[in-house]
Amino acid sequence: ARWLVSLNNYDDAAAKKKAKDRPLPSMGPGWLGRIGVIYVKGSNLFETLMRNLMFLQDGGELWEPDVPCWELEDARSGERTEVACPDNFAELMTMQFRRALLERKENKVVGYTVLGGDFFDSTNAFAEPMTLWNKKEDKKTGLVYYDPRKHEMGKQLWREFSAISDRGGHKPGVIWWNTYLQGRKLLSRKEILQVCAVGVEYGAQSASMKDCYTDALSMNLELLNELGRTWQICVDDEVNNCEQAARIVGRLAQNLALAAGDKNDTGAEAARAQFYFAVDQPFRRWLQGIDPETDEPVEKAAEWQEQAYRLAAELGRQMVEQAGTAAFIGHRVPDKKNPEKSYLYTAPKAYNIFLYGLRKLYPKQDEGGTE
């Protein structure tokens, strides 16, 4: 049963066309393979189901009466059938994104045939409550619209905080639902929300499954309600600062490579990944430790900035120490626009540039902590 659910929702877009007498629309992978799935994890299975089973659409409107696929007046059997976005939860949860025929032998499934099934336009498909959203603007009309936001392989979920909190546009339905439950006093004011993420990366033309993604993030639920706007700005600012710090670390790796005469440009990406690895667990602990009722945003931000500065500075020192003698002596690199000019790159110079950028990003910090 779990395999069948997975096939229906995550199947790739490899050719499954059967009809040869008529053109059929392109439909892509199964629905869950096209979105960045998130859900809320409870303390047990029942609580998990209740925390994700939305009895209201996000925004508070009632769903239309439930019509699962087996209760449709006219059962759909056509290949690659485009349908309207579901207006009721049961239809969405039971939609046949693939037509699967199971081959049975002595009460066992020994094979199957699969064709493309139902699909709908993902633009503004807010009936789907378990996805992040990307805010976009039509270049011709200027109208704003939203598309599901897929998870980026290797990118920690806390770096998507703006999309979880709706700072980036539309709040995911399950997040809205849990803040609604808390607002109705069905969840504690001290509730720690555990957000889980699942995603799939496909290969060229989505013809095969290439990689999968899982992550989880815990935080105080009050951070995500309407009264938590100040905290959302605070956390989002620190996420953005981490992005800038990662670029500063990557630039140090580039400059050290040039100082050593190495033209290989892969070191910067590896250095950025190393920085994110260093700050990953500390950031998660900092985020989970925020209590909106007793903490002050300025103080908590300063607490994190001290950690971030210290971790980045330590990583920078290690990179310089490991750069080697050639990097300390230095290397001249010709100017790309004017070959007659050249610039001297050395490890000490690269380190000074790194420290300047880091201190500019975190001006109240030094290697010993808060000034």
Regions found by a protein language model. Give the residues of each.
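Extended alpha-helical scaffolding segments
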Residues: 1, 6-371
